Amino acid sequence: MDTKVACLLLIILGALTVQGAVSGNKRINPLHARQWGEQCMNSMEEFCVPEYSECPPEYEPCREDKYCENDYYCCCRYSGY
């Protein structure tokens, strides 16, 4: 019985890992950001865009501690680094 449970847990963990890899982990986990981060400012430096759209030129997805409303993510002005 313990072997079956261990196999099932490995399968579930593998499925979650593959799902994260397929999504590219480009978008942050909003629950983590809301707990530990700060809200996106919606200014010229950073603003929210719909989840399945791209950041405009000269902007990129913000670091992981920025969050927006549900189904949106934060774009920040590209720093050039």
Curated annotation (Swiss-Prot):
Keywords (A to Z) from UniProt: Cleavage on pair of basic residues, Disulfide bond, Nematocyst, Neurotoxin, Secreted, Signal, Toxin
Gene Ontology CC: one annotated term: extracellular region
Compartments, as annotated in UniProt: Secreted; Nematocyst
A single MF term (Gene Ontology): toxin activity
Entry superkingdom: Eukaryota
Keyword ATP-binding among UniProt keywords: no
Signal peptide residue numbers: 1-23
Residue stretch(es) of the prosequence: 24-25
Covalent S-S links between cysteines: none
Post-translational modification: Contains 4 disulfide bonds.
Keyword Secreted: yes
UniProt similarity note: Belongs to the Cnidaria small cysteine-rich protein (SCRiP) family. beta subfamily.
Function: Induces neurotoxic symptoms on zebrafish. Has also been claimed to be implied in calcification, but tests on homolog proteins suggest that proteins of this family have a neurotoxic function and not a calcification function.
Protein's UniProt name: Small cysteine-rich protein 6
